[in-house]
């Protein structure tokens, strides 16, 4: 315990003592120096800090507001209306970065069109033993086996409730908040865990995510089976509908990329049958694509980043077809450019998310994706993002 406290104090000292350097790099963020971040700053930080310490530092810096507001102005063509809300732009931060709702406002400042917090479990839990995050810089990829490390519902609720009025205004301005729910490792009743999450955090969310696709909690992915999924989602929807007030969040399901054709058909069938509001496609993959170069490529866990990109996009394409384009999809997996985002949108995604790209390219990647996406939309004759959703299926 003493060693953990010492490490925490040391990391806090880095944050405080490094303030001058952080302010300098903040200036570079404001001026959009993508090259500096990708070629010098991010590799330098990775040499200094192990992946989990770097993650903690990033969350802390963002939560303190040390990074300036992005100056890029979202044009009307980037606006999307979906899930009962307006999204100023379609690029969000995926769950996993801000697991405990500590850095929401700082993330909006970077230019994200929406923020997803979590995964949050009912009770606090440590997650899996360290080390549990591994960089594959040669592949622009990460393997993680965090295992739903979480401060728990009570702490996250308190944190988000303190900014509830601020979030209400942000949502009205086109910057919604999503909350990703998980189950505790030792829980024997998954449905009860997710239901508790809905009751506790539902009133604070614009959308909720039922995460049944993390590969790092034993037995979790089995909840994607047709019978199990129907039971779980029926309970979740019942709890959502029972929430007091008129502000009831949309309910989405986050699925894995490692599914059989039958699995995908079953998920689509259950989603249509129960009236699920949306799908998040996809989580990390347990597969290891041929050609990975990173020395740590054989580590156990979920793989994210560039090697996941095409598998994720293909799964989006299939789920859009299986749901006849009637269930909105948030596409995630390997997005680091406007081209990546547009490919997912044309495959059927209404919105996209990124996370791993931040690790290797830094905060400027958010504006880069939006700027490139806008240029590509114009180049290909689309007047809005909405016009491009599912365009591949209309050819």
UniProtKB/Swiss-Prot annotation:
Stretches of the chain found on the membrane's Mitochondrial matrix side: 31-395
Task: Give the record's membrane topology.
Answer: Single-pass membrane protein
Instruction: Please list the cofactors this protein needs.
Output: FMN
In terms of superkingdom, the source organism counts as Eukaryota
EC annotation from Swiss-Prot or TrEMBL: 1.3.5.2
Chain ranges sitting on the Mitochondrial intermembrane side read 1-10
Q: Which NCBIfam families match?
A: PRK05286.1-2, PRK05286.2-5, pyrD_sub2
Function according to Swiss-Prot or TrEMBL: Catalyzes the conversion of dihydroorotate to orotate with quinone as electron acceptor. Required for UMP biosynthesis via de novo pathway.
Assembly with partners or alone: Monomer.
Write the protein's name. Answer: Dihydroorotate dehydrogenase (quinone), mitochondrial
Gene source species: Rattus norvegicus
């Amino acid at each position: 315990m003493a060693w953990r406290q010492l490490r925490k104090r040391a990391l806090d000292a880095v944050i405080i003592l490094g303030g001058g350097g952080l302010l300098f790099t903040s200036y570079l963020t404001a001026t959009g120096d993508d090259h500096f971040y990708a070629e010098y700053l991010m590799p330098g930080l990775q040499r200094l800090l192990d992946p989990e310490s770097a993650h903690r530092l990033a969350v802390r810096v963002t939560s303190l507001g040390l990074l300036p507001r992005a100056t890029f102005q979202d044009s009307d063509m980037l606006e999307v209306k979906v899930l009962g809300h307006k999204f100023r732009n379609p690029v969000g931060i995926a769950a996993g970065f801000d697991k405990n709702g500590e850095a929401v406002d700082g993330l909006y400042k970077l230019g994200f069109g929406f923020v997803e917090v979590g995964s949050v479990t009912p009770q606090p839990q440590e997650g899996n033993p360290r080390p549990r995050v591994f960089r594959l810089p040669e592949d622009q990829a990460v393997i993680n086996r965090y295992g739903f490390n979480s401060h728990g519902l009570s702490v996250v609720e308190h944190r988000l409730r303190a900014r509830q009025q601020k979030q209400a205004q942000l949502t009205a301005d086109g910057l919604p908040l999503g909350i990703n729910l998980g189950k505790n490792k030792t829980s024997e009743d998954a449905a009860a865990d997710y239901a508790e999450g809905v009751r506790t955090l539902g009133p604070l969310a614009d959308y909720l995510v039922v995460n049944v696709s993390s590969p790092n909690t034993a037995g979790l992915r089995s909840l994607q089976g047709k019978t199990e999924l129907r039971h779980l989602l029926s309970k979740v929807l019942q709890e959502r509908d029972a929430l007091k007030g008129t502000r009831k969040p949309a309910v989405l399901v986050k699925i894995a990329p490692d599914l059989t054709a039958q699995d995908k058909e079953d998920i689509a069938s259950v989603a249509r049958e129960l009236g699920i509001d949306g799908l998040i496609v996809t989580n990390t993959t347990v597969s290891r694509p041929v050609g990975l170069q990173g020395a740590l490529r054989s580590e156990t866990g979920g793989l994210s980043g560039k090697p996941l990109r095409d598998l994720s996009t293909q799964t989006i394409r299939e789920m859009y077809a299986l749901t006849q384009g009637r269930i909105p999809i948030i596409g995630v997996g390997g997005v680091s450019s406007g081209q990546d985002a547009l490919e997912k949108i044309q495959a059927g995604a209404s919105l996209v998310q990124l996370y791993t790209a931040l690790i290797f390219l830094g905060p400027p990647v958010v504006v880069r994706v939006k700027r490139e996406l806008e240029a590509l939309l114009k180049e290909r004759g689309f007047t809005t993002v909405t016009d491009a959703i599912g365009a591949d299926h209309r050819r």
